[in-house]
Amino acid sequence: MTNMTQASATEKKGAGDLLRFKIFGMPLPLYAFALITLLLSHFYNAIPTDLVGGFALMFVMGAIFGEIGKRLPIFNKYIGGAPVMIFLVAAYFVYAGIFTQKEIDAISNVMDKSNFLNLFIAVLITGAILSVNRKLLLKSLLGYIPTILAGIVGASLFGIVIGLCFGIPVDRIMMLYVLPIMGGGNGAGAVPLSEIYHSVTGRSREEYYSTAIAILTIANIFAIIFAALLDMIGKKYTWLSGEGELVRKASFKTEDDEKAGQITHRETAVGMVLSTTCFLLAYVVAKKILPSIGGVSIHYFAWMVLIVAALNASGLCSPEIKAGAKRLSDFFSKQLLWVLMVGVGVCYTDLQEIIDALTFANVVIAAIIVVGAVVGAAIGGWLIGFYPIESSITAGLCMANRGGSGDLEVLSACNRMNLISYAQISSRLGGGIVLVIASIVFSMMV
């Protein structure tokens, strides 16, 4: 009887632990209700293709695969953990035909038609920049562009060396490998690069783009992996890392900002107002007022970084409003990131492109170029007054990934979402710098 009683108690304890297990903060029975609802919707192919249907699908799917990615050994340390697991599984669901067309449409409407990605990035930029000491922000922005240039130089040198080892000429390495990888992603990088290539050389833009996007896809994977590795290095060698802070304050001495008082929901709502209005102003500037400078188009997120920085420097925002914007930014980055990554996997990740690009030479060359970007940005950042880990992530890896969605993948892999403003400078302003370099390189080939 004693043994039976103990066995019964053990079974009850096991059942109790299972019922208390939480997925995305929800007890297992409650999550099971949400999952069963989603499966019914999938079985009957009945899902509204609007924000409600899209968010329901993205929340439920992101929750389960986020928990798996967070707990999976090796993957959670070296590959990027939950966010990377989510977008890879979501991309596979599209590739394998598991998602119905209605489900793809629902997610696409959230990401593309409603452009949730723009809102997500706008909120993170506003919160990240307004939370930084005003004087420190201005000094760091002035030093950041040279750090980006150091990353480009590092990527070019490493790329040329490894290219020569494979018997590839210098001009071809720069044209087909270094520039696409460091060019700011797909829409702001590979696409305009192919147009510049066509207009300068007269050759096929399609031929250039197909090669460029394949190389960029491989580099983006390495950027995510290296981000996770850099996070581990920073934890072991703490003097190399600012734990999410880019600037070494010993190098940029400033007075502390005034402390915020009590923060209410209203200040958080004001953070949303500032995020959307600053984005709107940046969009107007980029599309109508100053669509290009010296023939180079500047992306609206690059303008937004400058606008929010100017707003911070102006002193118009009280400490409470700044804290409200930071609270909103934290909510998006901590509670909605898994949701967003489902959309990234469905809308911005093509597994077939990744598979097609996996040749030995392409993999090795792309990896070495990304390493060069990391080394160059780390050295340049250290000399200017930044932490090497953070400068190599933002000015190195966020130059070598695939733009806005790549920034989120890289920063989530190394747990540094608060660096999104610098990542956007890399993807947008840095990408513009690469387009200027491309115009020169391509013209030398004619």
UniProtKB/Swiss-Prot annotation:
Major subcellular location class: membrane
TM segment ranges: 23-43, 46-66, 79-99, 110-130, 148-168, 213-233, 267-287, 289-309, 335-355, 364-384, 425-445
Disulfide linkage: none
One Gene Ontology cellular component annotation held by this UniProt entry: plasma membrane
Membrane-protein topology: Multi-pass membrane protein
Annotated citrate binding sites: N186, G187, R402, G404, S405, R428
InterPro entries attached to this UniProt entry: 2-OHcarbox_trans_Prot/Firm, 2-OHcarboxylate_transport
Catalysed reactions listed for this entry: citrate(out) + 2 Na(+)(out) = citrate(in) + 2 Na(+)(in)
Amino acids binding Na(+): I181, G183, M399, N401
Coiled-coil intervals: none
Cellular location(s): Cell inner membrane
Keywords attached to this entry: Cell inner membrane, Cell membrane, Citrate utilization, Ion transport, Membrane, Metal-binding, Sodium, Sodium transport, Symport, Transmembrane, Transmembrane helix, Transport
Function description: Secondary active transporter that catalyzes the uptake of citrate across the membrane with the concomitant uptake of sodium. Is specific for citrate.
Subunit-level organization: Homodimer.
Protein family: Belongs to the 2-hydroxycarboxylate transporter (2-HCT) (TC 2.A.24) family.
Protein name: Citrate/sodium symporter
Organism: Salmonella dublin
